[in-house]
């Protein structure tokens, strides 16, 4: 099916492929399985993204990395490698990575899917904090009704290819 849509001011239907990097800089992505580079420490994982998106000034890069690590509560973990972190810490690095370019929108795909309930709640509190304090919109996909009921927000449910806005969720 076809339709019209825009994301953070970019019309998607006939978007010039040259504009995609600019759209991408306005989006942050949080993955279910973290997608961290295992051969780099936390700091270098974040630095890789900044370099890939055009950052050149070393001082600004360091400031930004310190800022996002502080926002997600990992200021002292920059030297650690992903395998040295808990699942919750790895997900916080993933959230930090999503924040690097100060996005207008974060797309979170099952951000609590690989986490225990307590750690899931910590990540949800972090995402709510980011949305409230920084004005970043967050669209999250989840099938976890516990998360939906514990952290109420505007909920959209899909069924048979259609979006149902503000659907009542029955547990």
Tell what function each PLM region has.
Residues 40-48:
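Short coil-to-helix segment of the ABC ATPase nucleotide-binding domain corresponding to the Q-loop/switch region
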Residues 95:
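Hydrophobic anchor residue at the start of the ABC signature
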Residues 12-28, 58-59, 133:
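ABC ATPase NBD coupling module
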Residues 81-85, 89:
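Conserved ABC ATPase signature
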């Amino acid at each position: 099916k076809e339709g019209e849509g825009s994301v953070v001011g970019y019309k998607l239907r006939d978007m010039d492929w040259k504009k995609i990097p600019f759209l991408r800089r306005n989006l942050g992505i949080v993955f279910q399985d973290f997608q961290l580079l295992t051969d780099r420490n936390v700091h270098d994982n974040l630095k890789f993204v900044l370099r890939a998106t055009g950052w050149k000034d070393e001082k600004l890069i360091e400031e930004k990395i310190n800022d996002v690590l502080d926002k997600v509560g990992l200021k002292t973990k920059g030297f650690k490698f992903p395998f040295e972190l808990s699942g919750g810490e790895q997900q916080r690095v993933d959230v930090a990575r999503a924040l690097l370019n100060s996005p207008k929108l974060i797309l979170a795909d099952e951000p609590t899917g690989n986490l225990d309930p307590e750690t899931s709640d910590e990540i949800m509190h972090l995402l709510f904090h980011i949305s409230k304090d920084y004005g970043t919109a967050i669209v999250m996909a989840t099938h976890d009704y516990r998360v939906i009921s514990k952290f109420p927000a505007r909920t959209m449910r899909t069924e048979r290819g259609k979006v149902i806005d503000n659907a009542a969720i029955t547990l």
